[in-house]
C-alpha cells in the first residue's frame, strides 16, 4: 500500500519551521538568562539550543499539517479550484501554525494516557483486569491486521453537537473542549496513538448544521476536502445521537452532503456510532414496559434507531460497484462517553444492558479495516471535472473526465517527469490506470495497482 500526498513539498518545511520559531525564541531566551550568570556556559547552552531547534523542526515536519503555497498549486495543476483556493488563502498561515501547535500537545498527552488500547500491548496494564477472551480476541485481530499494514486512518463525520470529539476523548483519553451549539473542532486534525507497533489515526472534523449558518458548513466541507486530499481512508465513523427518535431531514441532509462531496465509496467501510446511549429516553420509549424495566425499552429503542440508519444507507451502498461485494448493511454501535458512565468489574464502560461499549466499537473498527477496500481520496481532482448543471453527461464525457484525473495523479509522482514521457508510454499507463479508478476518479483498491 502506498499513500500519495499532493501537498507534500519543500514549501511544507518552510511553513513548519516558521511556525516553530516562536517556541525556539522562548527556549533561547531561557538559556540566555541562565548564561548571564556564567560566561563559560554560553557555548554549551547555545549548542543545546541548536539541538532543541533541530528536534522541534524535525517533529513539525508532519504530512498531516496542511500547508499549500501558490507555487505548489501551480506545480500540481490545482489552480482551477478557485472555490477552494480563494476561501483558504487568508487563513492558510494561521491554520498551519495552529495545526503544528496542536500536534505537539497531542503527542505529549498521548504518551501519558491509554485507557483501553493498552490491553492490546499487555493484559492487566495499570492494574486493569480485562477478560482473557477480550484481550486474546483483540490481540489476534491486531496481529492479523499488522500482517497486512501497520496503520489505520479513521474518519469522524457528523453534525455539530452529536459527540464526535467526546468519542475521540474516550478512545484516546485526551481532553478536547466540547460545546453543544457550536462546533468545537474548527479545522480537521489527526489524533494518533501507537499501540504494539500499530498506529491508529482518527481524523476529527468540524460538525455540520452549525448554529453559525450555512456559510460555515460550506467552508467546513472545503476544509475537509482539502485535508483528505491524498490521504488513504480505511474506515469512517458517522456519529449521531442515540436519544433521538426520528430520522428526519437533518440526518438525510448531512449524509447526502458527504455522499455528494466525498463520493458514495466513503461508506464502503463505515459504521454509525450512536452517542449518549445511557441518557434518559423519551417517555414514549417506555410504553408497554414495567416502570422498573430499563433494559427492555433501551434495547427496543436501539434496534429501532439502528434500523433507521441501515435502511437509509442501504440505498447508498447499492450505488457502489457490485463486483467489489459492498456490504448490504452498515453496522451501528451504541456509545456512552460520559465520565459518569457505569463500569463493570473490569473497569470497562458498559451500556444499560451491560455491554462494554468501547470494546465493541474498537473490535468492530478493526474488523472493518480492510486495505483492499481502502480508497485514496482525490476530491480536488474530481471537482475540477464536474459538469455543469444543464449537462446530463454521457459515457464519453465520463471516460474523458477519468483520463484527465489519471493524468493529474500521475504528474504527482511519476519520475522522470510525466510531460517528458513518450506518447506510447503515456497511452499505455493511462490504459492500465483507467481500469483502476472508479467513476469518481478515486482509487478504491490500492493493492490491485
UniProtKB/Swiss-Prot annotation:
Residues 8-46, 67-77 have a biased composition (Low complexity). Belongs to the TRAFAC class TrmE-Era-EngA-EngB-Septin-like GTPase superfamily. AIG1/Toc34/Toc159-like paraseptin GTPase family. IAN subfamily. Residues 275-278 are annotated as: G4. Residues 149-386 form the AIG1-type G domain. GTP binds at residues 158-165. Residues 204-207 are annotated as: G3. Residues 158-165 are annotated as: G1. The gene is gtpA. Residues 1-77 are annotated as: Disordered. GO terms for molecular function: GTP binding. Residues 336-338 are annotated as: G5. Gene3D superfamilies: P-loop containing nucleotide triphosphate hydrolases. It holds the Pfam family AIG1. Keywords: GTP-binding, Nucleotide-binding. Residues 183-187 are annotated as: G2. This is GTP-binding protein A.
Amino acid at each position: 500500500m502506498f499513500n500519495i500526498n499532493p501537498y507534500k513539498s519543500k514549501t511544507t518545511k518552510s511553513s513548519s519551521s516558521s511556525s516553530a520559531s516562536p517556541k525556539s525564541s522562548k527556549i533561547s531566551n531561557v538559556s540566555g538568562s541562565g548564561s548571564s550568570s556564567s560566561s563559560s556556559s554560553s557555548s554549551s547552552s547555545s549548542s543545546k539550543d541548536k539541538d532543541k531547534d533541530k528536534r522541534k523542526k524535525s517533529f513539525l515536519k508532519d504530512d498531516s499539517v496542511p500547508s499549500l503555497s501558490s507555487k505548489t498549486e501551480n506545480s500540481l495543476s490545482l489552480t482551477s479550484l478557485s472555490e477552494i483556493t480563494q476561501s483558504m488563502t487568508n487563513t492558510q498561515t494561521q491554520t498551519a501554525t495552529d495545526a503544528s501547535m496542536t500536534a505537539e500537545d497531542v503527542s505529549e498527552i498521548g504518551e501519558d494516557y491509554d485507557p483501553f488500547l493498552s490491553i492490546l500491548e499487555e493484559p492487566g496494564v495499570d492494574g486493569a483486569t480485562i477478560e482473557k477472551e477480550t484481550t486474546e480476541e483483540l490481540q489476534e485481530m491486531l496481529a492479523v491486521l499488522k500482517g497486512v499494514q501497520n496503520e489505520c486512518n479513521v474518519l469522524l463525520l457528523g453534525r455539530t453537537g452529536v459527540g464526535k470529539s467526546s468519542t475521540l476523548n474516550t478512545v484516546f483519553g485526551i481532553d478536547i473542549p466540547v460545546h453543544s451549539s457550536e462546533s468545537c473542532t474548527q479545522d480537521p486534525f489527526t489524533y494518533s496513538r501507537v499501540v504494539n507497533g500499530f498506529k491508529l489515526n482518527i481524523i476529527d472534523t468540524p460538525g455540520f448544521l452549525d448554529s453559525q449558518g450555512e456559510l460555515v458548513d460550506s467552508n467546513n466541507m472545503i476544509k475537509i476536502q482539502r485535508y483528505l486530499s491524498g490521504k488513504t481512508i480505511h474506515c469512517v465513523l458517522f456519529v449521531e445521537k442515540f436519544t433521538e427518535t426520528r430520522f428526519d431531514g437533518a440526518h438525510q441532509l448531512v449524509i447526502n452532503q458527504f455522499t455528494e462531496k466525498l463520493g458514495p465509496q466513503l461508506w464502503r467501510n463505515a459504521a454509525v456510532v450512536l452517542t449518549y446511549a445511557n441518557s434518559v429516553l423519551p417517555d414514549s420509549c417506555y410504553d408497554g414496559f414495567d416502570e422498573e424495566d430499563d433494559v427492555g425499552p433501551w434495547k427496543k429503542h436501539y434496534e429501532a434507531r439502528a434500523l433507521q440508519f441501515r435502511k437509509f444507507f442501504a440505498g447508498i451502498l447499492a450505488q457502489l460497484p457490485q463486483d467489489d461485494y459492498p456490504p448490504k448493511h452498515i453496522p451501528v454501535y451504541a456509545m456512552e462517553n460520559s465520565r459518569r458512565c457505569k463500569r463493570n468489574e473490569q473497569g470497562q464502560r458498559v451500556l444499560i444492558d451491560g455491554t462494554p461499549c468501547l470494546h465493541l466499537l474498537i473490535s468492530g473498527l478493526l474488523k472493518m479495516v480492510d486495505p483492499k477496500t481502502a480508497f485514496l481520496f482525490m476530491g480536488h481532482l474530481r471537482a475540477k471535472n464536474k459538469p455543469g448543471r444543464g449537462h446530463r453527461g454521457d459515457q464519453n464525457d465520463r471516460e474523458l473526465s477519468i483520463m484527465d484525473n489519471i493524468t493529474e495523479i500521475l504528474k504527482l509522482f511519476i519520475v522522470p517527469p510525466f510531460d517528458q514521457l513518450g506518447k506510447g508510454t503515456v497511452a499505455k499507463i493511462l490504459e492500465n490506470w483507467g481500469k483502476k479508478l472508479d467513476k469518481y476518479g478515486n482509487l478504491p483498491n490500492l493493492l490491485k495497482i
